[in-house]
Amino acid sequence: MEINTVLFDLDGTLINTNELIISSFLHTFETYYPGKYGRKDAIECIGPPLTDSFKRLDPERVEEMVATYRKHNHAHHDKLVEPYEGVYETVKTLHEQGFKLAIVTTKIRETAMKGLKLFGLDEFFDVIVALDDVENVKPNPEPLEKAMNALGAKKEETIMVGDNSHDILGGKNAGVKTAVVGYAIRGEDYVRQFDPDYVLRSMPDLLDIVGVKAR
């Protein structure tokens, strides 16, 4: 069957929040554990919900650390977030061609909307499934299934596009096709080991996969 539905991860996929996220983790690490953790540790934390990352450090202070992270993140958001080349044009083309589009992210809705609006992507998405909308996050299929239900989509006509293992595994668990961006911060070799159906060198590659000619 032809693909008519695209579920997108947000961070590291549609918008380049890598330096913002790393900066926010480093700020939080330094606040609670001065000199103990560095950039590599911050990169390891990218992907899962904040609560999972901070729970490994100190289960007793998770909420406090999440609040510290988010305060720094929101304060520096617009300065550190950057667009990825070809993303806006690709999403716009899919929207104009009548594709069903949704965001499936482990961010809270407020922060997700902040990123989408920064680059004018919010107008293309009627469905956003965020951390505060689900009981279970990727790689559990719940958020993907919730997005598909909201869109009236069939799994055999859907593809999940992301930049990390939980996006690929979440797609597989939901029974949909998967695509991963080759510009993922952990590198293409890392994401390939999770066996995505497609690897995108850049976002416009997605148009070929779903049968749309780039303009």
From Swiss-Prot:
It holds the Pfam family HAD_2. Its cofactor is Mg(2+). One of its GO terms (cellular component) is cytosol. Keywords: Hydrolase, Magnesium. Belongs to the HAD-like hydrolase superfamily. PpaX family. This is Pyrophosphatase PpaX. GO terms for molecular function: inorganic diphosphate phosphatase activity; magnesium ion binding; phosphoglycolate phosphatase activity. GO terms for biological process: DNA repair. Hydrolyzes pyrophosphate formed during P-Ser-HPr dephosphorylation by HPrK/P. Might play a role in controlling the intracellular pyrophosphate pool. It is an enzyme of class 3 (hydrolase). Its EC number is 3.6.1.1. It comes from Halalkalibacterium halodurans (strain ATCC BAA-125 / DSM 18197 / FERM 7344 / JCM 9153 / C-125).
